[in-house]
Curated annotation (Swiss-Prot):
Methylated by PrmC. Methylation increases the termination efficiency of RF1. Peptide chain release factor 1 directs the termination of translation in response to the peptide chain termination codons UAG and UAA. InterPro entries: PCRF, Pep_chain_release_fac_I, Pep_chain_release_fac_I_sf, Prokaryotic/Mito_RF, RF-1. It is found in: Cytoplasm. The gene is prfA. The modification N5-methylglutamine is found at Q234. This is Peptide chain release factor 1.
Amino acid sequence: MFESVQGLLDEHAAIQAQLGDPAVYADQKLARKLGRRSAQLNGIVEAYHRWESIRDDLAAAKEMADEDPEFAAEVPELEASLETAAAKLRRLLIPRDPDDARNVILEVKGGEGGDEAALFAADLLRMYSRYAESRGWKTELISATESDLGGYKDVQMAVKGNSNDPAEGVYARLKFEGGVHRVQRVPVTESQGRIHTSAAGVLVLPEVDEPEELEINQNDLKIDVYRSSGPGGQSVNTTDSAVRITHLPTGIVVAMQNEKSQLQNREAGMRVLRARILAHQQEQIDAENSAQRKSQIRTMDRSERIRTYNYPENRIADHRTGYKAYNLDQVMNGDLEPVIQSAIEMDEQARLDAIGE
């Protein structure tokens, strides 16, 4: 059992030797790559040694069981521990998403429902901000287009984590949030107290660590400049500081107007553009990988309705995993972990099933 782990143990040992060589850090790109891979393997190595230790203890207990009742009494407990350790190791051996350890750019757009949808988009952004805070992550507002009532027509926020462990990476935790989030509640603009349904779309993009990691040919870019505008479309700048960047090969378009200068908006736009191109490339890889296609959760498609937030019933329901709870007030305040974990566990099971086929 777990014969394939030996190759990973050897790789881990080789990486530790490299990281112990000060000369490696002269190449920061290589050092980061080795650090990420080391973090990916650390959990597997620890889990394997734990399983191996219990296996050996069980073998010794069985050998001594006939002569010593105390050893015989340990056998059932060790067998249960061995199965638990084996299950953990099997899950760790599931091929991980290569982007799991990355930071993300989170985009939220108000959808059906006009002003109410924009207000809900703002509520979602606040929810994710508080969840990030609870995990010790840092957030940075990149761009926002406000509605007349103070919501967001669209907004982009960077989320930066504090761990190299892929399982604890920002993208690993947030990637299943992509899709349509539907809300049912009485809008602030509703005078009759009627419940309305509106929606907001969420897109989670893995962020490129360094600009040189993803080369973009400047000849592939079309850059337009214009005057920035505020709620209602009124002009808020007398200079052409807003920037629209089109990546011609993919057709991806990024518009940025929040910063005061054209240069700052261009830099922010390129940051988002790199993330979108990286996501586009990963989608193409996923389409060619049958194991990835069998994952029941992961999606970049914001047209898929993934969750409903019902305020009158204080209920949240995830339509992919079947998760349901009546603590919506807590969820909107950032208590997202149980909801997110349900998606992660369903995805892990789907990947395990795919490996077994």
